[in-house]
Amino acid sequence: TTIDIEVASDDGFPKPEFAEYPVITISCKNNIDDIYHVWGMGEYTPDRNNVVYYECADEAELLLSFLAHWHNPSNCPDVVTGWNTTFFDIPYLINRVTKVLGDEKAKMMSPWKHIRERIVRDQHQNENQTYEITGIQQLDYQDLFKKFAYTYGKQESHKLDHMAYVVLGENKLSYDEYGSLHVSTSLTSRSL
């Protein structure tokens, strides 16, 4: 399962350890049946048959609906992937669920309701918060790319926009070009 979250932050890149801003969209792609599950606030009608959209009234409903889906044994993944999920998506999501819904709900990220916080240092000795989710392996594409994509040569940046251009010849969606994700979640099908 691939996961990506969008956060309502106009103040730059949000810090996952504080999880100060609301989660406004969660997208998961089930790699077995190729179905995209998207939770968002606001009206949206998918234009593809393999997209299921869950319209939520507010962030609490969005998080609860996502957790109910994720924790269901038929949906709970063995492996979760994504870009920078180890140091952003997963910690932000767990911290935000804890802040909005409490510790017990955050534990629903694990099929055994057991998550463990870890603090790890990056190559610059900065401390980063991450979580081990019992029962689910995490494969972060950004980390894998840094370790194994040497055929692309040394990169000036490992941000998604740069790496998408290097590998695919395309840039990440621009907020300026497509509008704000705070107003509309209709971008989700385009970015999937």
Regions found by a protein language model. Give the residues of each.
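Inter-lobe coupling/hinge region of RecA-like P-loop helicase motors
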Residues: R48-Y53, Y178-S191
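Metal-dependent phosphoesterase core characteristic of DEDDh/y 3'-5' exonuclease domains
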Residues: V23-D33, V79-S184
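Conserved RNase H-like, two-metal-ion catalytic cores of nucleic-acid enzymes
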Residues: T1-V79
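Generic alpha-helical secondary structure signal
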Residues: A60-L64, P91, H158, R190
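Serine/threonine-rich low-complexity intrinsically disordered regions
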Residues: D47, N72, G102, S174, ...
